[in-house]
Regions:
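Bacterial Sec-dependent N-terminal signal peptides
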Residues: 1-18
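Phosphate-group recognition and catalysis centered on beta-loop-alpha active-site segments
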Residues: 14-302
Length: 302
């Protein structure tokens, strides 16, 4: 019996941290709550920088969210905006600049110019591989290029990609590959978008698309989000919520945004989300969320 336990322990050690997180995401019964750092550790380093990613990894998050744009010469770089104006010492649209030029720029924060440069997606993948999962935002239009980069690094399932595209459109991307990134539909439960997203939601639930999770955004203009949550959970997928700002998670009157969890209010915000069955949370205050989850025994990998 002891030798059996020893073998199990050795097997667990042989798995990378990323693989262990993936196993929890794939397990519908797991109560482990996956913490996603929005634009990585941007409170201490420039957003989407390698330093911010490293900071988030050391913090203990499960996934870093990064945004990608493609340069004039076809290189994917980690940048949220279509231009480099806000985040770097340069100017211009990413699509009209070369990767070499962008590599000469320095990233900026509200405090000023930093020592850090804008990384390529390749550099980000090499840093994160096996250590933390990645959520690539704004990436569906570059799906095949990203897939190739991941396959070369043997880390295809270490990336979550998402969109509000129709299942039939997504299927065209997935069908080209024998192994795909983890896919997540974005569903907006709002008065402004629900007319379109209601049939989108139904079509995903009825489709063969292997949706690992559903990102549900709601602003309080419609009632009944709990029914949407429950249907996601019943499907066997994970329920992903963004606690970044009010309009993504309940609206001003019933917001679950991170700032409302400050000053000892974690139970009222994060605790309620856990009761709703949320098991993936993208946060702008990942350390606050991690501390809370660990205090509740909801962030311990087997």
């Amino acid at each position: 019996m002891c030798s059996l336990f020893a073998l199990v322990a050795v097997a667990a050690l042989a798995q990378s941290r990323a693989e262990r997180i993936i196993a929890e995401i794939r397990n519908p019964k797991s109560k482990y709550v996956v913490v996603i750092a929005h634009r990585s550790d941007w409170r201490h380093y420039p957003e989407n920088s390698l330093a911010a990613m490293e900071g988030a990894i050391k913090m203990g998050v499960d996934m870093v969210e990064i945004d990608v744009q493609r340069t004039k010469d076809g290189v994917l770089v980690c940048c949220h905006d279509k231009t480099v104006d806000r985040t770097t010492t340069g100017t211009g649209k990413v699509s009209e600049l070369t990767a070499d030029y962008i590599s000469t720029l320095k990233l900026k924060t509200k405090e000023g110019v930093t020592e850090y440069g804008m990384p390529t997606l390749a550099q980000a993948l090499d840093l994160c591989r096996d250590r933390v999962l990645i959520n690539i935002d704004k990436g569906m239009n570059y799906y095949n290029q990203i897939q190739k980069m991941l396959a070369e690094r043997n880390m295809v399932e270490q990336v979550v990609i998402k969109s509000s595209k129709k299942p039939t459109t997504v299927a065209k991307y997935l069908d080209k590959h024998s192994q795909n990134m983890l896919y997540m539909p974005i569903i907006n439960y709002t008065a402004r978008k629900w007319e379109v997203h209601s049939p989108l939601f139904e079509s995903y639930l009825a489709s063969d698309i292997p949706s690992i999770a559903y990102e549900i955004c709601w602003d309080g203009t419609l009632k009944g989000e709990r029914k949407i949550f429950n249907r996601v959970i019943k499907s066997g997928a994970k329920l992903w919520v963004n606690t970044l700002w009010d309009s993504l998670c309940g609206g001003k009157e019933h917001s679950f945004a991170d700032n409302h969890a400050l000053n000892g209010n974690e139970d009222k915000i994060y605790g309620k989300l856990l009761k709703y069955g949320v098991t993936m949370i993208q946060s702008d205050r990942p350390q606050l969320l991690l501390d809370y989850l660990e205090s509740k025994g909801r962030h311990t990998l087997p």
